[in-house]
Amino acid sequence: MARAGWTGLLPLYVCLLLTCGFAKAGKLLVVPMDGSHWFTMQSVVEKLILRGHEVVVVMPEVSWQLGRSLNCTVKTYSTSYTLEDQDREFMVFADARWTAPLRSAFSLLTSSSNGIFDLFFSNCRSLFNDRKLVEYLKESCFDAVFLDPFDACGLIVAKYFSLPSVVFARGIFCHYLEEGAQCPAPLSYVPRLLLGFSDAMTFKERVWNHIMHLEEHLFCPYFFKNVLEIASEILQTPVTAYDLYSHTSIWLLRTDFVLEYPKPVMPNMIFIGGINCHQGKPVPMEFEAYINASGEHGIVVFSLGSMVSEIPEKKAMAIADALGKIPQTVLWRYTGTRPSNLANNTILVKWLPQNDLLGHPMTRAFITHAGSHGVYESICNGVPMVMMPLFGDQMDNAKRMETKGAGVTLNVLEMTSEDLENALKAVINDKSYKENIMRLSSLHKDRPVEPLDLAVFWVEFVMRHKGAPHLRPAAHDLTWYQYHSLDVIGFLLAVVLTVAFITFKCCAYGYRKCLGKKGRVKKAHKSKTH
């Protein structure tokens, strides 16, 4: 009888458990960025969907990677450009990096290849021009916004709908991360983005670091002028970059202190470096055949990322010449024109399973542009690197890995075939590179929580608590002179000067009185003698 009673109640218990699970589920708005930025953000979104959250992704109808195979609601809006326009402008930008590097805010502002940024920055105007979509978002009652800050549209959306936001990024160009999080960044040992400096800067480098910081404050507002105009138009009030970035609840930063130099951080800055790493799978048979044919020498993996498909012919031939002089088999991800001097040991492929190949025991080195995804896959799998940075954070990533003895950096504009050959032979034959990258790999993997789980936790945290105001520093409420304690310094200086002035006056008065009295005594004594 009792057993029958329990059996009868079983469906009720199941329903209660399911109800509890759904009660904890929230509603999340996702505003992503196209290209490689989406690769790891997608993994967080997919896990949130698996955990029962209702996810809505808002994206432009023109994109390279966005929204593919997502089991959630995807809302698109029309854009003022076509996919051909986007491809063309990106090719202009990428091709220009083979002739003119971006090493400062001024060079970025004055570059003639910035059309791709104008396209991306226009997305938010297109989104808010879709009144039907805006109305849908307004009525959806989201718990939070999960966003990539590259084009600032997610930040504008969060501010427009008054929603707490979780930013997902490697870093923020200009000074907007430090300003938005109110995080100190001493210029004496925290290098600015794009410079490719280490934390142990020479006097000259510290001078350049200060100049770069000044450049950012002078020129970044002009670079983001279109974004700020669009934001002001949408929010119907003058908007600064600080207004957009300073309301972020949590910063999910795709780095950690295995890659980064030690520096001050704030409590709402969460480090999830290596979130793109995963357990390597067996490589496809085609690639396994290449590996087996390489013999004892093994293979070298060569990829400049998903966004760089072609290399200038002269440079491609110099690279091909260097690759032909090493005994390893080289798997080169390349879709450009086949170099005429390509050696037999070099195999061109349009796609390769990068992480799986790096995890193969026969992989000896990785030639990379030093994007954060590739660098972390190299760290996770313990493969030394030859780095050829092109733009963005790549110069900084390369410098960090070179400083830690995990690879060699080459200037892609100036390097010769011999430079690449020597760099490859160094990282393959010098055991210190392998030992250093394995040490970094061990440090990176020694953590209490996996980066993906940590990212999911903090997104859910913001959804549950409608933000994280307890992590917001009071520095946001101070004026610039209060933040730097200039009013306190001024007051204390005034007190010291006042006390010094009064003391001086008292001493002067006492001295005059004393001197006057002594003078009168002398005068009286002199008159008596006469």
Swiss-Prot record:
Keyword Lipid metabolism (UniProt): yes
Membrane topology: Single-pass membrane protein
Tissues of expression: Liver and gastric tissue. Isoform 1 and isoform 2 are expressed in esophagus. Neither isoform is expressed in liver, kidney, colon and small intestine.
Signal peptide: 1-25
Superkingdom per UniProt: Eukaryota
GO BP annotations listed: coumarin metabolic process; estrogen metabolic process; fatty acid metabolic process; flavone metabolic process; flavonoid metabolic process; liver development; negative regulation of fatty acid metabolic process; retinoic acid metabolic process
Keyword Endoplasmic reticulum found: yes
CDD domains for the chain: GT1_Gtf-like (cd03784)
GO CC terms in record: endoplasmic reticulum; endoplasmic reticulum membrane
Pfam family, one: UDPGT
Chain ranges passing through the membrane: 488-504
Compartment(s) of residence: Endoplasmic reticulum membrane
InterPro entries: UDP-glycosyltransferase (IPR050271), UDP_glucos_trans (IPR002213), UDP_glycos_trans_CS (IPR035595)
Annotated glycan sites: N71, N292, N344
Keywords: Endoplasmic reticulum, Glycoprotein, Glycosyltransferase, Lipid metabolism, Membrane, Signal, Transferase, Transmembrane, Transmembrane helix
GO molecular function annotation: enzyme binding; enzyme inhibitor activity; glucuronosyltransferase activity; protein heterodimerization activity; protein homodimerization activity; protein kinase C binding; retinoic acid binding
EC numbers: 2.4.1.17
Catalytic activity, reaction form: glucuronate acceptor + UDP-alpha-D-glucuronate = acceptor beta-D-glucuronoside + UDP + H(+); 17alpha-estradiol + UDP-alpha-D-glucuronate = 17alpha-estradiol 3-O-(beta-D-glucuronate) + UDP + H(+); prunetin + UDP-alpha-D-glucuronate = prunetin-5-O-beta-D-glucuronide + UDP; 5-epi-5-F2t-IsoP + UDP-alpha-D-glucuronate = 5-epi-5-F2t-IsoP-glucuronide + UDP + H(+)
Subunit structure: Homodimer. Homooligomer. Interacts with UGT1A1, UGT1A3, UGT1A4, UGT1A6, UGT1A8, UGT1A9 and UGT1A10 to form heterodimers. Isoform 1 interacts with isoform 2/i2 suggesting that oligomerization is involved in negative regulation of transferase activity by isoform 2. Isoform 1 also interacts with respective i2 isoforms of UGT1A1, UGT1A3, UGT1A4, UGT1A6, UGT1A8, UGT1A9 and UGT1A10.
Note: UGT1A7 isoform is part of the UGT1A complex locus which displays alternative use of promoters, first exons and terminal exons. The locus is defined by 13 first exons, which are alternatively spliced to 3 other common exons and 2 alternative terminal exons 5. From the 27 possible mRNA isoforms, 9 produce functionally active polypeptides (UGT1A1, 1A3, 1A4, 1A5, 1A6, 1A7, 1A8, 1A9 and 1A10) called isoforms 1 (i1). Use of an alternative exon 5 (5b) as terminal exon is leading to 9 additional alternatively spliced products termed isoforms i2 and which lack transferase activity.
Family of this protein: Belongs to the UDP-glycosyltransferase family.
Protein name: UDP-glucuronosyltransferase 1A7
Species of the source: Homo sapiens (Human)
Gene responsible for this protein: UGT1A7
